[in-house]
Curated annotation (Swiss-Prot):
ATP 2 binds at residues 707, 746, 748, 752, 777-780, 820, 832. This is Carbamoyl phosphate synthase large chain. Mg(2+) 2 binds at residues 298, 300. Binds 4 Mg(2+) or Mn(2+) ions per subunit. The keyword Manganese applies.
Length: 1072
């Protein structure tokens, strides 16, 4: 049937900020859905409070609201825009939960808005654990023994009858939030108690553990006419018990017999039909390795992380098709955009193997528990495509950017066998490398299978890789051996390491033997039909299917997997760069390996190479394509770190030169430049050893700010207050960046200010100046930032402009540059310069309307800003305010210090925008989970150094009518100052916190970092029980200011289109 006649305007709910469990895959699917609806002539209204995604650009949806997706706000948008339908199944758990609330509040009926795609009844049946269990039993599909509980006592009764281990899964949550595996009563009580608080409906499922069974997933599509197809089967390398988001996943499933495959495929189709899901759906099964017995684990009645992986693995655009199904189209009426010939009612066929490996944040949080289980901890993932499992796995490993180019890691090889065997027995982020090492030490495959429950098929494949390592080690690098190694997926660098030679020697030998990669197309149909899209992967010793043409083209290097410090902001920049190249008539080529992102969609660039971002892989593509040059400024530190080696291999870098990048990244060279330019910088020095560091500390005094070179997200950056802290730090930092100097600066206790600019080497355009709410010493990615800056004098603003121009010209920047300043007592200091796209480019582009990435691309290609219609200097500031708030995923990462510091910890961000400053700040606080009520109970536990400053805070709290509670030392100090507070012990405060007694906690850390520290426990409890936590007095003061002055009903709900119209009037006099 054709699309619904009465649907001409659709409201799409976006997924909000990037958090563990709900990352960029929803931005990718949401973006694809918006484009898909517009293709059908539907007007699209979007609600999403994430400024970092391309989805919230006005190019994607027709009308964009960067507002918090709450029932109250969305009702206002519905009343204003009057959409005919609402699409919620592409916004992750945020979208689903909101759709259910809107329906239950009667808002959809009140405004006659049709819920498109899957109905609320179907969502509830899939998401509510008890309803789901009943539905499966009704259709004869097996589910594990389980009980839905709303209290701890019922969970303990179930445990008494069925024994341990048990798996706990809360209803209506994502990424396994609040779930876990309990092995005894104590663990069960703890997990269920927390899970009940995390569940939107106060329910958890307690089920008999199927730990050790195979976990198999099917991605299925269904339309309103009951047509169904399976898109892809996927197999988890790790058995049941590890969250699929934390598991290595292979597509198609590798170890199923044809009987097992058909059995689970039939069950998948039966389930999607019974649930009446319209669109995409992910079904997870547990399969007994010893029989054909299986259980249905769960169903996601929406596009999910696995859907994004299945889309990229097959080339079948699930979200695009799901959006068309939602407005009434049938699968056989929708064209497959990859082949251009077949319809979407066509099951994809794969003639290659896809491997996904999660990217965990443990390089940032080396104190956290590295074990993985039912609660997800990965921030992102990589995907690789090859012709065999071995080659696909090795390609994925080197895409992770964890300094692993194969399965041999020095840190693992130095471990004792007993330790290796212990680490194999528990799932953790390094288990793949431990298993490889066990195989090297001739540990029996049966034993490893028995301990890990990983299928022997996978273990035999790992054994093949280990045997190949041995063959390389023991023989001359003949043509045959090199060919065999390359075909198995070994990188030049790994072969060089095994042989103890240089990577370039292997590359030279490989070329001498005539061993080059061949490139293949992803076409959804195993080459049965010709592909019209350019979605490419490499392999060895096969026919090359990819033709190159002698036309102007440019390679954009992507940013790889999402991790803390390098999020989707960089994917936003890569996508904008590809579009800008297309506009100039130059063919755009992207190299990236992240299956969650828009940049790796089959039609974003003219050509997509789904490959690791390593020197070898980039050089191979460069030599094949022969482009005008390569752009590294949009791919974050991933691309920047490759620049030196690319230049050595005569690759032309478009934009700022490597020499300039090196000056800004090398702290010593950069300091010298600032001195020459007569620009203020914090006093400091450079240390290569602990002794150097001690000498500098003696000269400068404490506190000090210490950081290594060439890192992102402030990795390993700390504020140190004592000599011992400094010694411990330098020892660790030299491991992160060996041979690179450690920068030691005198800490400046001032306001932090940030600028993004576009430079053509002569003219410098500054779209705006952002001011941080928190003082220096908090990483810029973790600060609340305000645009336009509110507390700078005219003289300070002029100095910031002058310094930005001086530095941009001295470095001959051709493109984007980001500069961070500290301002103290009227003096402006330069803290850091990044001559590339920064994480604030998307939010500043949206706030000001300046197309920063487009200008940077044009400038890199040789144009001048004046030719493009822009003058230098500071762009007129907006008459509205934008506030960027960080969003953290700390509840998923146990034993991690949550207080703000120089090292970045946030996984995402949200934006508050309003005609008033207080309104924008209020929205930002609410979106970041830091909304405090106008009255309530506030707990304070303050470090001694902050006592004085806390007095004015407490006076403000009391004047606003809050009840003050304080821990002993804090309360005692307040008493001395004549301030009344209810005083209690920390242990009692933590107990009350768990029971939801307090409305907010203010805790500035003393020592921090140590899990046995009482303050650490207080902060962790606040995070785990979702109580607003403030670890900076600056943030809570700003929050009180917003809460006390804002009339919530008076907040403006304007679209970005309306804000941009307001700003256009502002700039008329500046544009040439």
């Amino acid at each position: 049937m054709p699309k619904y006649k009465d649907i001409s305007k659709v409201l799409v709910i976006g997924s909000g900020p990037i958090i563990i469990g709900q990352a960029a895959e929803f931005d990718y699917s949401g973006t694809q859905a918006c484009k898909s609806l517009k293709e059908e002539g539907v007007q699209v209204v979007l609600v999403n409070n994430n400024p970092a995604t391309i989805m919230t650009d006005t190019d994607i949806a027709d009308i964009v609201y960067i507002e918090n997706p709450t029932v109250e706000v969305v009702e206002k948008i519905i009343a204003k825009e009057r959409p005919d339908g609402i699409l919620a199944t592409l916004g992750g758990q945020t979208g689903l939960n909101l759709a259910v609330k809107l329906k239950e509040a009667g808002i959809l009926d009140k405004y006659n808005v049709k819920l498109l795609g899957t109905s609320v009844e179907s969502i509830k049946t899939a998401e509510d654990r008890e309803l789901f269990k009943r539905k499966m039993q009704e259709i004869g599909e097996p589910v594990a023994e389980s009980v839905t509980v709303t209290n701890v006592e019922d969970a303990l009764k179930f445990a008494k009858n069925y024994g341990y281990p048990l798996i706990i899964r809360p209803a209506y949550t994502l990424g396994g939030t609040g779930g876990g595996i309990a092995h005894n009563d104590e663990e069960l009580i703890s997990i269920v108690d927390l899970g009940l608080k995390k569940s939107m409906v106060g329910e958890v499922l307690v089920e008999k553990s199927l730990y050790g069974w195979k976990e198999i997933e099917f991605e299925v599509m269904r339309d309103a006419a009951d047509n169904c197809i399976t898109i892809c089967s996927m197999e988890n390398f790790d058995p049941v018990g590890v969250h699929t988001g934390d598991s290595i996943v292979v597509a198609p499933a590798q170890t199923l017999s044809d009987y097992e495959y058909q059995m689970l495929r039939s069950a998948s189709i039966k389930i999607i039909r019974a649930l009446k899901i319209e669109g995409g759906c992910n079904i997870q099964f547990a399969l007994d390795p010893q029989s054909h017995k299986y259980y249905v684990i769960e169903v996601n009645p929406r596009v999910s992380r696995s859907s994004a992986l299945a889309s990229k693995a097959t080339g079948y655009p699930i979200a695009k098709i799901a959006a068309k199904i939602a407005i009434g189209l049938r699968l056989d009426e929708i064209k497959n955009p990859v082949t251009g010939k077949t319809t979407a009612f066509f099951e994809p066929a794969l003639d290659y193997v896809v491997t996904k490996i999660p990217r965990w944040p443990f390089d940032k949080f080396y104190t956290t528990d590295r074990r993985i289980g039912t609660q997800m901890k990965a921030t992102g993932e990589v995907m690789a495509i090859e012709r065999s499992f071995e080659a696909s796995l090795l390609k994925a490993v080197r895409s992770l950017e964890i300094k692993a180019y194969g399965l041999r890691l020095d840190s693992v090889r130095g471990m004792g066998t007993k330790e290796i065997l212990e680490d194999i027995s528990v799932p953790n982020d390094m288990r793949l490398f431990y298993i490889a090492e066990a195989l090297r030490r001739n540990i029996d495959i049966d034993y490893i299978n028995d301990v890990t429950k990983i299928d022997k098929w996978f273990l035999n494949k790992l054994s093949n890789i280990v045997n190949m390592e041995k063959e390389i080690e023991e023989n001359e690098l003949s043509k045959e051996i090199l060919k065999k190694a390359k075909r198995m997926g070994f990188s030049d660098r790994e072969i060089a390491t095994i042989k103890g030679i240089k990577e370039e020697d292997v590359r030279t030998l490989r070329k001498k033997y005539g061993i080059y990669p061949s490139y293949k197309m992803v076409d959804t149909c195993a080459a049965e039909f010709e592909s019209i899209t350019q979605y490419i992967y490499s392999t060895y010793c096969e026919e090359d299917e990819v033709e190159t043409h002698d036309i102007p083209k440019v390679i954009v290097i992507g940013s790889g997997p999402i991790r803390i410090g390098q999020g989707i902001e960089f994917d936003y920049c890569s996508v904008k760069a590809l579009w800008a190249l297309k506009e100039t008539g130059i063919k755009s080529i992207i190299i990236n390996n992240n299956p969650e992102t828009v940049s790796t969609d089959f039609d974003t660039g003219d050509r997509l190479y789904f490959e690791p971002i390593t020197l070898e892989d980039v050089l191979n593509i460069y030599e094949k394509e022969k482009p005008l040059g390569v752009m590294v400024m949009f791919g974050g530190q991933t691309a920047i770190n490759l620049t030196e080696e690319l230049v050595k291999n005569e690759v032309k870098i478009l934009g700022t030169s490597f020499k300039s990048i090196d000056i800004s990244e090398d702290r010593e060279k950069f300091s010298k430049l600032l001195k020459e330019l007569n620009i203020n910088q914090p006093k400091g020095g450079y240390a290569l050893t602990v002794e150097d560091a001690k000498d500098i500390a003696l000269k400068l005094g404490f506190p000090l700010l210490v950081r290594p070179s060439y890192v992102i997200g402030g990795q390993s950056m700390e504020k140190v207050n004592t000599l011992q802290e400094l010694i411990d730090y330098v020892k660790h930092a030299t491991e992160v960046s060996p041979g690179k100097p450690v920068l030691i600066d005198k800490y400046i206790d001032g306001r932090e200010v940030e600028v993004d600019a576009v430079s053509d080497g002569e003219c410098v355009l500054i779209p705006g100046i952002m001011e941080h709410i928190e003082r220096t010493g908090v990483h810029s990615g973790d600060s609340f930032s305000i645009y336009p800056a509110r507390n700078l004098t005219e003289r300070e603003i002029n100095t910031i402009i002058e310094y930005t121009e001086k530095i941009s010209k001295a470095l001959n920047v051709k493109g984007l540059i980001n500069i961070q300043f500290a301002v103290k007592e009227g003096t402006v200091y330069v803290l850091e310069v990044n001559p590339r796209a920064s994480r604030t480019v998307p939010i500043m582009s949206k706030a000001t309307g300046v197309p920063m990435v487009k200008l940077a691309v044009e400038v890199a290609l040789g144009k001048k800003l004046k030719e493009l219609g822009y003058k230098g200097g500071l762009w007129p500031q907006t008459p509205y305010t934008v506030v960027k708030a960080p969003v953290f995923s700390m509840e998923k990462l146990t034993d991690v210090e949550v207080s703000l510091s120089p090292e970045m910890k946030s996984t995402g961000e949200i934006m508050g925008i309003d005609l008033s400053y207080e309104g924008a700040l209020y929205k930002a606080l609410e979106g970041a989970g830091l909304k405090i009520p106008k009255k309530g109970k506030i707990l304070l536990s303050i470090a001694e150094r902050d006592f004085q400053e806390a007095v004015s805070l407490v006076e403000k709290l009391q004047s606003l009518g809050y009840e003050i509670y304080a821990t002993y030392r804090t309360g005692k100090y307040f008493s001395l100052m004549g301030i009344h507070a209810n005083i209690m012990s920390l242990d009692h405060a933590i107990k009350l916190l768990k029971n939801g007694y307090f409305d907010a906690v203010v805790n500035t850390p003393t020592k921090g970092k140590k899990p046995d520290n009482a303050g650490f426990k207080l902060r962790r409890t606040a995070v785990e029980y979702r109580i607003p936590l403030f670890t900076s007095i600056d943030t809570i003061k700003a929050a009180l200011n917003a809460v006390s002055k804002v009339n919530v009903n008076g907040l403006s709900v304007l679209s970005m289109n309306e804000y941009q119209e307001i700003q256009k009037d502002n700039v008329k006099n500046l544009v040439l």
